């Protein structure tokens, strides 16, 4: 059995390596899987939740998370790979206890000439109190499980759009890049690779800042308030017309 070989190797010269076990989340978890996890608990460092992160509905993914996480040990890292990985998917995964997330969102957008644009920083306590989850009469409370994963348009600036021909502002107000929208639009129109390099840099920076902000509010025990603030600030509560 493969895990037995892994156990032998880890007990010899690879004691510092990690063993990540892939578990399908789209099937009913039977006793074989739970027995395997229990038997090799000492060598399994993390669990990769496979079979999710594609085009499944919000309800399907939420149910899968709940089913699989109920039987997994709390002390194991949980991994997931998302074919998209937009901000709502990130918040949803962390909300359900996923530790490591591999998204494709920043790269996919850059490849297609698009930039991430979103409000990130809930700067003060007053903002946080406005979304206090203890107040049951608060209208600013949303269920992350009920939001549409695919409402990406709220986070995207499509620099292929001709409307940016004369727009000399930077990509976003919080971008690390100084190039203007009009310049990047020109590069895209000329099929210059530089445009995708600039957009990849921008998108990765924004996503890194996003994860840092999430980590900050988790440490401050304020993550649920941040979710509600993020939804409200980025107008994700509004239905598409």
Curated annotation (Swiss-Prot):
The keyword Glycosyltransferase belongs to this UniProt entry's keyword annotation: yes
Keywords: Glycosyltransferase, Transferase
InterPro entries assigned to the protein according to its UniProt record, in alphabetical order: Queuine_tRNA-ribosyltrfase, TGT-like_sf, tRNA_ribo_trans-like
Domain of life: Eukaryota
GO aspect biological process, one term: tRNA-guanine transglycosylation
Annotated signal sequence range: none
Single GO MF annotation: glycosyltransferase activity
Pfam families referenced in this protein's UniProt entry, alphabetically: TGT (PF01702)
Coiled-coil positions: none
NCBIfam families: tgt_general
PANTHER family hit by this protein: QUEUINE TRNA-RIBOSYLTRANSFERASE ACCESSORY SUBUNIT 2 (PTHR46064:SF1)
Entry's family note: Belongs to the queuine tRNA-ribosyltransferase family.
This protein's name: Queuine tRNA-ribosyltransferase-like protein
Organism: Plasmodium falciparum
Taxonomic lineage from the root: Eukaryota, Sar, Alveolata, Apicomplexa, Aconoidasida
């Amino acid at each position: 059995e493969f895990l037995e070989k892994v156990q032998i190797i880890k007990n010899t010269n690879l004691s510092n390596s990690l063993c990540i076990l892939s578990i399908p989340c789209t099937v009913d978890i039977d006793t074989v899987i739970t027995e395997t996890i229990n038997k090799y608990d000492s060598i399994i460092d993390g669990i990769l939740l496979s079979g999710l992160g594609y085009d499944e509905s919000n309800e399907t993914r939420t149910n899968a998370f709940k089913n699989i996480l109920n039987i997994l040990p709390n002390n194991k890292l949980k991994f997931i790979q998302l074919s998209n990985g937009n901000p709502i998917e990130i918040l949803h995964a962390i909300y359900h206890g996923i530790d490591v997330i591999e998204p494709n969102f920043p790269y996919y957008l850059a490849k297609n000439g698009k930039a991430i644009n979103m409000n990130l920083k809930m700067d003060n306590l007053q903002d946080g109190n406005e979304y206090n989850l203890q107040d049951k009469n608060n209208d600013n409370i949303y269920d992350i499980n009920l939001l549409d994963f695919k409402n990406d348009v709220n986070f995207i600036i499509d620099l292929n759009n001709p409307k940016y021909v004369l727009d000399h502002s930077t990509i976003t107000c919080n971008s690390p890049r100084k190039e203007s929208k009009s310049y990047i639009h020109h590069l895209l129109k000329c099929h210059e690779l530089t445009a995708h390099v600039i957009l990849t840099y921008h998108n990765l920076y924004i996503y890194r800042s996003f994860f840092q902000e999430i980590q900050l509010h988790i440490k401050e025990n304020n993550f649920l308030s941040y979710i509600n603030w993020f939804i409200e600030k980025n107008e994700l509560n509004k239905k598409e017309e």
